[in-house]
């Protein structure tokens, strides 16, 4: 029987929470990102494919929340299913993904401000200016200090952010419907295209041809990371089981919320194809919706969207500042990281995790000055790494299905995992390889945790750590030598990577000795 929690949240409210929580900054740049990769027909097919894959993930998460209530979070599923090392890889990846997403927010926020002061905050190649780096650094440290004071969950802030987010999007949908031209939308609907660009990367023209199956596959492949990025955080949809009035409501809300998000995203990504040509959309610049609404209704529309986006991003950035440290705190509680990471201040905030994360964020905020198209670089990094976490969720359900001999769980878990793995293979493996540099840092801390808790790494863990660390080192050389086209795929060169790696090594050594000292104070010897 489905017991009722009288103080719980009803179905409609659950759906609203899921939708408002999932819509972040990525949706504001969705239209032009997709236009650079796909024609309208390709976008439609891509949404069908991605929607089905995300549905399988949500169903997997929802089943685990209801049937494994003793487990908490994505990394805990990986640990329960495949051991401590895999649980650590998932949790550390979640940490990495969350702060990479924050950097993407920072870049997008400054491109919004650049709408009012063209050329001041963003360079033509998509990198941030020195002034922008200074501004986002101040904002980032300010948000970290706010979270350390325990204000990340203020209801008033969330309400303001929700209004600032939804009003411009509603205006955009209305304007998109009013200005929609069927002839513009249907032109080249099912055709393949080749973009002819100048030295600055601006599309001068598109050359059209009849689309083949391979062409359509290429368009879907090119849209994968952009579309999955706007669903990053969807795991929160399945974590509502203990807050729902009925447990069955959590499952229904997950499905209804996903459908609502798909409708919103499809409208926002397809309506512009009925107002501008694909070439014009691809060249609108960042953030896409700001420039498109400006073209639709005039300057007031662009200003409304830009202001709404800045407020929305600040709110999302504030919430996401806590996400990475929640991951490291949980790893500490599970004894997969040293207890140093779980230490709380008098406000209940994990101060050490916050400061370490902010130091690493600061390093990569500086990198945004050197990286062309910085927004997409960090979007891809964030999305690629979290897809590993999502794949492990599906694999855990698949494993449970085999153990319980439940066919539905076997099928759902397999599809959820296969979708994430295939999407990574076709679109993001280069970023996973690059992320191994940061995993190498994590493995050092994982070993320290083992020391603190009086255990040793197993032979399998030592071998896995060695292999993954070597691959991380090879990634550095791979970028320098442009192995397998890494520089083109990642959008960074060797010198830019050096800007990040050198201070990262310094921070790693500092943290290592601080944590080691903390462990030794407890009387734990080698």
UniProtKB/Swiss-Prot annotation:
Main location per the UniProt record: membrane
Example of a GO biological process term: amino acid transport
Disulfide linkage: none
UniProt keyword terms in alphabetical order: Amino-acid transport, Antiport, Cell membrane, Membrane, Transmembrane, Transmembrane helix, Transport
GO cellular component, as recorded: plasma membrane
Phenotype upon gene inactivation: Deletion results in loss of the growth advantage observed in the presence of high L-arginine in different growth media.
Topology relative to the membrane: Multi-pass membrane protein
Catalytic activity: L-ornithine(in) + L-arginine(out) = L-ornithine(out) + L-arginine(in)
GO molecular function: antiporter activity
Membrane-spanning ranges: 8-28, 41-61, 88-108, 128-148, 160-180, 220-240, 255-275, 297-317, 354-374, 378-398, 407-427, 428-448, 466-486, 495-515
Subcellular location: Cell membrane
Protein's UniProt keywords contain Membrane: yes
Pfam families recorded: AA_permease_2 (PF13520)
Function as written in the Swiss-Prot or TrEMBL entry: Catalyzes electroneutral exchange between L-arginine and L-ornithine. Can also efficiently translocate L-histidine and L-lysine. ArcD1 is the main L-arginine/L-ornithine exchanger in the arginine deiminase (ADI) pathway.
NCBIfam families: 2A0302
Family: Belongs to the amino acid-polyamine-organocation (APC) superfamily. Basic amino acid/polyamine antiporter (APA) (TC 2.A.3.2) family.
Record-linked PANTHER family: AMINO ACID TRANSPORTER-RELATED, ARGININE_ORNITHINE ANTIPORTER-RELATED
Annotated protein name in UniProt: Arginine/ornithine antiporter ArcD1
UniProt organism field: Lactococcus lactis subsp. cremoris (strain MG1363)
